[in-house]
Amino acid sequence: MIQANQEKENLEQKHAPYQKLEKLYEVFLEVKDRLNFNFVATTHSAMDLIASVLSDSKYYLENLYNKASQELSDKRSDKGEKLAELFDLLFEYIKDSKFERLKEPSAYDHSCKTLYPEQNSSQKMQRVVLRGYTYDKKIACHTIVDMGS
């Protein structure tokens, strides 16, 4: 069991920067009340966040940059530093050429292989609408948008 976990961690580190993903999501949680993007309410992980921002990275990064600048100049705000950190972390992912948006905005996974066990408790075939991106053409990171029978 321990060896399997270690192998999994090694694979994850090789294919995608997972530790930074955790940091990215922590920072996002601290400042999400300052963001007025539509996807904020449906973002439950760093994967969701990146998939959303990749949908129109120029728009989101410009807005986030402006918001961070505005908050940094506002002496009453304590979120400026965190917004700037969120911008830096997101920018690092977006400019990483290994990230590619999936060509189709939604795809169907009939095998449910991308579902985690707790999300597919019935073990029945379900139609899953996915969005996401690939990292280095090796790892596909999906966000589950909808599950239907």
Residue ranges and their predicted role:
Residues 1-149:
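Extended, amphipathic alpha-helical stalk segments that mediate dimerization
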